[in-house]
Amino acid sequence: MPEAPKKESLEVFDLTLDQKNKQKLQLIEELTSNADQVQRQVLEEILTRNADVEYLRRHDLNGRTDRETFKNIMPVITYEDIEPEINRIANGDKSPILSSKPISEFLTSSGTSGGERKLMPTIEEELDRRSLLYSLLMPVMSQFVPGLENGKGMYFLFIKSESKTPGGLPARPVLTSYYKSSHFKERPYDPYTNYTSPNETILCSDSYQSMYSQMLCGLCQHQEVLRVGAVFASGFIRAIKFLEKHWIELVRDIRTGTLSSLITDPSVREAVAKILKPSPKLADFVEFECKKSSWQGIITRLWPNTKYVDVIVTGTMSQYIPTLDYYSNGLPLVCTMYASSECYFGVNLRPLCKPSEVSYTLIPSMAYFEFLPVHRNNGVTNSINLPKALTEKEQQELVDLVDVKLGQEYELVVTTYAGLCRYRVGDLLRVTGFKNKAPQFSFICRKNVVLSIDSDKTDEVELQNAVKNAVTHLVPFDASLSEYTSYADTSSIPGHYVLFWELCLDGNTPIPPSVFEDCCLAVEESFNTVYRQGRVSDKSIGPLEIKIVEPGTFDKLMDYAISLGASINQYKTPRCVKFAPIIELLNSRVVDSYFSPKCPKWVPGHKQWGSN
């Protein structure tokens, strides 16, 4: 890691830092104040440079760059529509198929989003755009939490060892791409990217060695840590669970100043050796805190100067909020940015807001954005599960960035510099406000993560809320839900929903079977009217089942997903599973099973899908 500036230069450096912050904040003001002009310019630039690519020529755009012609001619697409082109590029076709600039690599989407690992084309200059968005985060944050430049961030960041396509292009997760780039590895000294983890520990492909060495370095520099985090809330909690399991070995290393022999990566050992020194006093401190029966507030106990926890807690990650609050003593939970493999989108301009109020301001220069209106009635999503191809009328419904309406929900559609054209990202967003002319969105869910037996369609948000309602029955028994997933079991007729629950038991009071049956019913009562009609009237859906699994089951699930190629950095517990080996893994660790004891309430006359 670069050294900190000498003390005598701090005054000048602070002034420069303040000026840099003001420049970045001014850039946000300019981009959001001129959002529509910037969007027109972005589209014109993309279409001009890609005028001769095969995909645009096939649709007879003929070099035109105006927005109206673009909207009338170019179709709104999904991944399946361009999969043949993607495969040609992956197999080595270097002709300008999607982009006039060479495709430098493929970014693999998370294996738990929609169930497939998709290859997203990217070009070299996209790294500049990603870096630009990263550069906006801390100037925004410094408005709310001053002095962050005086310490370090303890972030648990990981890479996945990359693969190659048949044509020789790297295929890797977007964060692996960024961490392996010169933009990250050779970044100039910046107090805002001054981390406790040396680059070598982040770039270690062995997840155990990477986690161990990053945690050790974080403990050694515990007084310097001002902020902690990971990408997802689940990843940060996994780091704390790792500490719970391995603190004895970590304390031994700190006491002796000798790194565990289990860490075999030479570059990691060399990097850690520059930080790890014998410190019996620090070892005693860490041991004293970790030996306590309660781990409540462990983050603020071990890293006492921490100001906030920087993790994604929107969408289904919101279920981890109580656990984060427990470990952090209620520190602010900060979601800083919104990004995906397809494109980096926006930033949170109010980072200290409550997790339930997180909104992202889309930065108009990142890509050309359009929005497909989505209508949700009584919790049932309609157009988010539209057929792959939109009708001509639905294509005409798309609106531009500055034309979205407050409170309306939309599916995000992007046109990128790297060659995605009117591509449905699949994220459902709700407009919560505006920064000048640029809208701000809350993230609702990823589309198509649903349970379905018959005509019922239960989306991710509905499932999350139903589970949240059900677990209140566990509170009197000092029990909570650690993790969960689900699947639609159609091996019997009628089919039924199955939830796998892993519990965290703090008390000794046994939980009666009737309580879990009440949980089953509470989940069903929370579902939409179509589901309840299927249970009560149509008899097309059987009683919901909750299966309790052994502790550690969801760690096994993650390990299995990683063994198949999922990125540890991007991994999120899937809320719905369909892959038979995963269901077999979960079923092999079931300790108890409970069914809903009766049908949920349902009143006729509110049918969502009638013949009329």
From Swiss-Prot:
Keyword Mitochondrion: no
Example of a GO biological process term: camalexin biosynthetic process
Organism: Arabidopsis thaliana (Mouse-ear cress)
Protein family (similarity comment): Belongs to the IAA-amido conjugating enzyme family.
Highest taxon above the source species: Eukaryota
Keywords assigned by UniProt, alphabetized: Ligase
Induction: By auxin.
Name of the protein this chain belongs to: Indole-3-acetic acid-amido synthetase GH3.5
InterPro entries linked to this entry: GH3, GH3_C, GH3_M
Pfam families found in the cross-reference section: GH3, GH3_C, GH3_M
Listed PANTHER family: GH3 DOMAIN-CONTAINING PROTEIN (PTHR31901), INDOLE-3-ACETIC ACID-AMIDO SYNTHETASE GH3.5 (PTHR31901:SF45)
Biological role stated in the UniProt entry: Catalyzes the synthesis of indole-3-acetic acid (IAA)-amino acid conjugates, providing a mechanism for the plant to cope with the presence of excess auxin. Strongly reactive with Glu, Gln, Trp, Asp, Ala, Leu, Phe, Gly, Tyr, Met, Ile and Val. Little or no product formation with His, Ser, Thr, Arg, Lys, or Cys. Also active on pyruvic and butyric acid analogs of IAA, PAA and the synthetic auxin naphthaleneacetic acid (NAA). The two chlorinated synthetic auxin herbicides 2,4-D and 3,6-dichloro-o-anisic acid (dicamba) cannot be used as substrates.
Alphabetized GO MF terms: indole-3-acetic acid amido synthetase activity
E.C. number(s) listed in UniProt: 6.3.2.-
